[in-house]
Amino acid sequence: MSDAFKPLLAKLADGQTLDEDDAEQFFAACLRGEPTPAQVAAAVTAMRLRGETVGEITACARAMRRAAIHLDHPYEVIDVCGTGGDGLHTLNISTAVGFVAAGGGLKVAKHGNRAITSKSGTADVLAALGVNIDASLAQQRHALDTAGICFLFAQAHHGAMKHVSPIRQQLGFRTIFNLLGPLTNPAGAKRQVVGVSAHRFVEPVAKALGALGAERAWSVHGAGMDELTTTGETEVAEWRDGSLRLFTITPEAVGLPRAALADITGGDPAYNAAALTALLDGQKGAYRDIVMLNAAAAFLVADRVETLREGVELAGAVLDDGRAKAALAGLVAATNSETVPAQVTPA
């Protein structure tokens, strides 16, 4: 069976790109464990050295979406997440943003995983906060219904990735796999804010989101960070209504002070959970500012506000009046509930 992939590998070795059909079929085969580990490693390394195309990223994400376990729901959900891999070890920003967004009235399907290169991934800090990260589909839906936010544990929804996970770990460098998490939300989010770890991915990821059916999405990179940042300038590629727009954002433009990276540097899950709890309890400072900026982007992408500055103001209000804290409490309760309403059924 593995001989069937040799022509495709030869094409990649010659520096050629794969069309979407070939890329999707190959990646689907990877998710079934058909190519050998050496063949998978060769393919993704060749793409990395040449530079992954929008078509290849889109096709691989499409194959991964098809293999996923999906969460059924009636809502227009939003996801805020990053590719990871920026190496800055910040506090959990997009996780905190999820609670602010939910507190502000959005339905948030937060897709995430345990830490790979950081000290504390979304799953790690949520577990430290008391969330059942292994919640069933019914519990996830119950959380979305009642708290406005659910957590979709990537390793549970994308079980087919078990075939390539050891290869990723053995390679030890970024490949196309690192881009796919934010592009494969199991709840089918069509509104997204996606942070990327390097400038070169800003535009391709936005285009891939558009090709995958996003209605409105931002792909962002902020001064080395896979978030909108208050430490400098953020590059944004916005996909909206079938077209792409590129622009930059500074914290000063939306009324926020500039911060030093040291002010938002995190630690282990317990440390980051304590910081997130303090944030939801009303603590002011650089962590609050960067969370408000990213939450503002979520509100804007979801058409909840008309300007980013208005989004910052809404985020501050949600933190101050306890709505964000209530969203966390609701997520903890729903994911640990042993009795889920009968009308909530898995997809």
Swiss-Prot record:
Cofactor binding: number and manner: Binds 2 magnesium ions per monomer.
Q: Which reaction does it catalyse?
A: N-(5-phospho-beta-D-ribosyl)anthranilate + diphosphate = 5-phospho-alpha-D-ribose 1-diphosphate + anthranilate
Binding residues annotated for 5-phospho-alpha-D-ribose 1-diphosphate, in chain numbering: 82, 85-86, 90, 92-95, 110-118, 122
| Pfam families referenced in this protein's UniProt entry, alphabetically | Glycos_trans_3N, Glycos_transf_3
For this UniProt entry, the molecular function terms from Gene Ontology, in alphabetical order, are: anthranilate phosphoribosyltransferase activity; magnesium ion binding
For activity, the cofactor(s) needed are:
Mg(2+)
InterPro entries in alphabetical order: Anthranilate_Pribosyl_Tfrase, Glycosyl_Trfase_fam3, Glycosyl_Trfase_fam3_N_dom, Glycosyl_Trfase_fam3_N_dom_sf, Nuc_phospho_transferase
Pathway(s) it belongs to:
Amino-acid biosynthesis; L-tryptophan biosynthesis; L-tryptophan from chorismate: step 2/5
> What domain of life does the native source organism fall in?
Bacteria
Name the GO cellular-component terms.
Answer: cytosol
**Which residues of this UniProt protein bind anthranilate 1?**
82, 113
Q: GO:BP terms for this protein?
A: L-tryptophan biosynthetic process
What positions does the entry give for anthranilate 2 binding?
168
Which residues of the sequence carry a binding annotation for Mg(2+) 2? Answer: 226-227
- State which Enzyme Commission number(s) the record gives: 2.4.2.18
Q: What class of enzyme is it?
A: transferase
Signal peptide per UniProt: none
* Known role: Catalyzes the transfer of the phosphoribosyl group of 5-phosphorylribose-1-pyrophosphate (PRPP) to anthranilate to yield N-(5'-phosphoribosyl)-anthranilate (PRA).
Q: Do you know which HAMAP family this protein is assigned to?
A: TrpD (MF_00211)
Q: What is known about its subunit structure?
A: Homodimer.
Membership in a protein family: Belongs to the anthranilate phosphoribosyltransferase family.
Name this protein carries in UniProt: Anthranilate phosphoribosyltransferase
The species is Caulobacter sp. (strain K31)
